[in-house]
């Protein structure tokens, strides 16, 4: 379905396109770029996909819009506008994004966000020692933001979800016992805790559990930029098939993966019923299996 929709948009756009060479310009938000290791990875993915497709598509440039983090809903609004601030955004997939923008169903982090550790208060550790199944985890209060992809998923699965109105208040609310834990990606949680150690010395990473919740991280393109979508699809496919994306993943997140020692933890699987039929779950080489993978490319 995505491929047909993208082809139609691309053909329509090119009916009015001049024959001379063009420069493909990607407009993306500051939160997509080199503010930290996580955002630097997003930038390198975009840049590499564009670079690999130069022989077919020609020159390109990347323009950064804004000077700070952009809320996801505002980013989507800009993505959908003609001449909006962005024409490419990388985020965990959600139904609204797939319906309104052009999704490129290639998981740019190879499912690394599927694996989540729990940030909690040290006084709660004994409680988590008794958790071995999804059924025993459900009654505990989980802190999330409504804009996160995990919100709808965990709501549907019967979790006791508590809303935090901003990213920063999550940590203060956890410290004040407003909820019991925050599930965070294994490549996120260590830096998040380290940067807040002085403010919240009682917050810790629960040492024995890992949640596995399928959360593909896609590039989304404006419906007004079908050529960019066509180009990124080609570039990301090359990156995946040639092992470039996997190598990049280990370069950026290898240290966090080694620190995680995920194989020693009890595993709780959570279904993601919001995923579309286009999710490439059958393409095993698109996904990293941390329980059976080497920590080198």
Which functions belong to the PLM regions below?
Residues 67-137:
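Acidic, polar ligand-binding/catalytic clefts
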Residues 80, 87-100, 182-202:
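A ligand-binding cleft/hinge motif common to bilobed small-molecule-binding domains
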Residues 32, 112-117, 121-124, 198-230, ...:
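Periplasmic-binding protein-like
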Residues 145, 149-156, 236-296:
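Ligand-binding clefts/hinges and TM-proximal coupling segments of bilobed small-molecule sensing domains
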Residues 21-99, 232:
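Extracytoplasmic small-molecule ligand-binding "clamshell" domains
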Residues 35-51, 118-158, 170, 187:
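Bilobed "Venus flytrap"/periplasmic-binding protein-like clamshell domains
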Residues 16-18:
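N-terminal signal peptide c-region/cleavage motif recognized by signal peptidases
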Residues 65-86, 156, 168-188:
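Short helices/loops that flank or line small-molecule/ion binding pockets
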């Amino acid at each position: 379905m995505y491929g047909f929709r993208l082809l139609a948009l691309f053909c329509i756009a090119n009916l009015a396109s001049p024959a001379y060479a063009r420069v493909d310009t990607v407009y993306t938000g500051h939160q997509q770029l080199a503010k930290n290791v996580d955002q630097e990875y997003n930038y390198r993915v975009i840049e590499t996909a564009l670079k690999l497709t130069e022989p077919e598509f020609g020159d390109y440039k990347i323009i950064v819009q804004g000077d700070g983090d952009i809320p996801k809903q505002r980013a989507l609004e800009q993505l959908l506008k003609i001449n909006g601030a962005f024409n490419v955004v990388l985020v965990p997939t959600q139904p609204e994004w797939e319906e309104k923008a052009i999704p490129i169903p290639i998981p740019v982090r190879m499912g690394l966000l599927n694996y989540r550790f729990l940030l909690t208060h040290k006084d709660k550790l004994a409680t988590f020692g008794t958790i071995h199944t999804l059924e025993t985890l459900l009654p505990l209060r989980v802190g999330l933001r409504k804009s996160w992809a995990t919100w709808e998923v965990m709501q549907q699965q019967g979790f006791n979800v508590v809303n935090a109105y901003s990213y920063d208040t999550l940590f203060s609310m956890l410290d004040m016992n407003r909820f019991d834990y925050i599930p965070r990606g294994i490549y996120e949680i260590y830096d998040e805790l380290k940067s807040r150690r002085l403010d919240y010395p009682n917050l810790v990473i629960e040492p024995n559990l890992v949640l596995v919740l399928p959360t593909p991280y896609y590039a989304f393109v404006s419906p007004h930029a079908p050529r960019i979508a066509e180009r990124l699809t080609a570039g990301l496919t090359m990156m995946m098939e040639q092992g470039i994306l996997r190598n990049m993943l280990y370069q950026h997140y290898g240290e966090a993966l080694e620190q995680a020692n995920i194989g020693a933890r009890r595993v709780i699987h959570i279904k993601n019923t919001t995923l579309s039929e286009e999710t490439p779950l059958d393409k095993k080489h698109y996904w990293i299996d941390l329980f059976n993978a080497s920590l080198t490319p």
